[in-house]
Amino acid sequence: MAYDLIIRGGTVVDGTGCEPYVADVAVTGDRVVAVGTDLGEAEKVYEASGCYLAPGFVDIHTHYDGQATWDQEMAPSSWHGVTTVVRGNCGVGFAPAAPDRHDWLIGLMEGVEDIPGSALSEGMSWNWESFPEYLDALEEMPRAVDVATHVPHGAVRAYVMGDRGAANEDPTESDIASCLLYTSPSPRDVVP
């Protein structure tokens, strides 16, 4: 079988915990299809002797929540071998988002992460309100990396509690019940 690409003689660190080993890696399309020795021919062959080959890295703590709406590459993470990013960390994010809370959510993100609010304001289209609508907006854009997300509790509190949530007031029992709806195992079922 002829592959699109073979990377020959690299030291493979496969993430399973086994010792690194020297092998060839064959790629067809955008998939690794074989790892071993003497894999045959390919349209392109790269010699990787002295180099390490590893699966893509998963960055479990990012704040790409806004950038994900305009940057297909998730730069600079994708430039450094990251193939999956997780967002919604530290309780900050941009959904659910009532229209009158956009600036507050941007300020919250700006305070947690050194991301200029002006970049977020100019970059985001805000073509969503609910968390499912946010996910739909993200799915419309092709990506260089996979994305996963937490439902950010700061956005949920502000959405459910309005000014009281933004002011960090204690939630009522009713507020907690409403917040739980937005953090259910299937937030796609909760649309305002």
Where are these regions (language model features)?
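Histidine-rich, glycine-flanked metal-binding segment
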Residues: 2-8, 12-56
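Short Asp/Glu-rich motifs
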Residues: 45, 65, 96-97
